[in-house]
Amino acid sequence: MERFPRSAADAQQLLQLAELFKQSAEIIAEEWNKEDFSRIKAETNSIKSNLGSLDTARILPSPRLHEATRTVLAITGAATELVAEPYSRIQEVACQYFESRALFVAAERRIPDLLAGAGEYGLSVGEIAEATGIEERKLSRILRCLCSIHIFRQIGTDRFANNRISAALKNNEPLRAYVQLFNLDIYTASDQLPKYLLSSQGASYKVHETAWQKAVGTTKARWDWLAERVSLDEVRPKEAPYPGLPDVRHLQPGPDGKYARPELDNFGLAMVGGGKVSGAAHAYDFPWASLGDALVVDVGGGVGGFVLQLLPAYPQLRYIVQDRAEVLQQAQEEIWPVEAPEAVADGRVQFMEHNFFQPNPVKGADVYWLRGIFYCVQILSALRTSMAPTSRILVCDQVMNTTAGCDEIPPAPSPLPANYGYYMRYPHHRDLAMMSIINGIERTPAQFTELVKQAGLKVNKIWNCRSMVGIVEIGLKNEKDRHHRRLSYMGFGNYTQLGIGFFSSAKGPVRDELQADEQA
């Protein structure tokens, strides 16, 4: 293998990284020592365990700790570029897919749960194999792979235990579902992506013309496919590359004798799991408390995972969760009766079937919240027609900075890439996943601004959060629009028209502004 000479500039950059690492490590150690977990009740991995106390140590790092942590993680990537032999690095990245597949096997077979009861001495691979149904020598190789990237811990010859990383999956159904989300149909779609990009549909951005359709053998958009009820034979597509779930023995038919696609239930739970990882900051790094008793409409809100995050800390807010009927059925029958039945019973949270490509039936809400959905001009335009002068759309999504940087997002400290490089791998992985399954795009600030402009709206602010995922605040574009909306909403019971009893006419900031305008 050919090696390449290193320059004096390379050596200087390595020393710069070492100094930056030292400074950041000292901050991390200092912040760790200041954290106090003793006053917070230990929580389980239930869906709503993100919130409940304004002491956020168990939920979020301090801003200073967050910055130092992402700097250290970014340094690992920058240092790898400097010190790794190029051929070895290319070889390593070419094979990394199997790390994700190994994690999927461990999560799907619930190995972290098995090890949780075994304590620090763990279980032999034979014991794990007997419980999971996987041949023990093959299972050992899968677990050794994960141990090498610091997921699980090998404590002897073919003996394994949880470490602090794998223990995060212990009894954690939402996070387990998120691991499965990528490793089911999304990765099969990625198998089809290279061929798809060179096909006649490769330049398309339509949701029904993606690599995913080739993977599962359908012409439907993914949402429509997920909503299907099928025979047991159809749960695992026979005429398509996608193999389906590894184990379907737990599935039960409905009264019609057919089965819901298991990917649908997994998707709803995975959105909660992903929200817990990337979305905890959004309940704290946006000033929700200043909104009073505002109405928050979670558009395309799935089973209501984000509302479950907000509810304990901001019980004065009022919430509507909107999504497709089959998703809301799961929310109302499986999730909310367990997690927050009192919020539904007293009317603080309600559910509404809605197709977000159509005008929103909730007129003049204070906040329209969109997280983790496919944003396009049509969706934003449909919301614009429902907005009052003080309404805002909050788009919770990855705002993609690049290694070259941009004016809207503060850069990483030198000599790191402007976007923190290695630390931001996940958003780029997710971007390619969206490309594969729905032709979605994770946008840069400039791309967000252009999209919003096309919808007749404007970007008011990008809220940087203690997360890889930011919040883009969007409002009406100009005073003409705002004046038109003000006249449209005067004198109308915006929420009572929907037959939703607890909403009064033009409440909160919207009502106050309209009254002030009339008095003026």
From Swiss-Prot:
Protein name: O-methyltransferase cicE
Residues binding S-adenosyl-L-methionine: 300-301, 323, 355-356, 371
Biotechnological exploitation: Cichorine and its derivatives are promising in the course of developing novel herbicides.
Keywords noted in UniProt: Methyltransferase, S-adenosyl-L-methionine, Transferase
Primary gene name: cicE
Function summary: O-methyltransferase; part of the gene cluster that mediates the biosynthesis of cichorine, a phytotoxin active against knapweed, corn, and soybeans. The first step in the pathway is performed by the non-reducing polyketide synthase pkbA that condenses one acetyl-CoA starter unit with 3 malonyl-CoA units. PkbA also catalyzes one methylation step to produce 3-methylorsellinate. The nonribosomal peptide synthase-like protein cicB, the cytochrome P450 monooxygenase cicH and the O-methyltransferase cicE are involved in the conversion of 3-methylorsellinate into nidulol.
EC number, as in UniProt: 2.1.1.-
Molecular-function annotations in GO: O-methyltransferase activity; protein dimerization activity
Family stated for the protein in its record: Belongs to the class I-like SAM-binding methyltransferase superfamily. Cation-independent O-methyltransferase family.
Organism of derivation: Emericella nidulans (strain FGSC A4 / ATCC 38163 / CBS 112.46 / NRRL 194 / M139) (Aspergillus nidulans)
Traits of the deletion mutant: Abolishes the production of cichorine.
A Pfam match: Dimerisation
Enzyme superclass (EC): transferase
Pathway(s) served: Phytotoxin biosynthesis
GO aspect biological process, one term: cichorine biosynthetic process
Keyword S-adenosyl-L-methionine annotated: yes
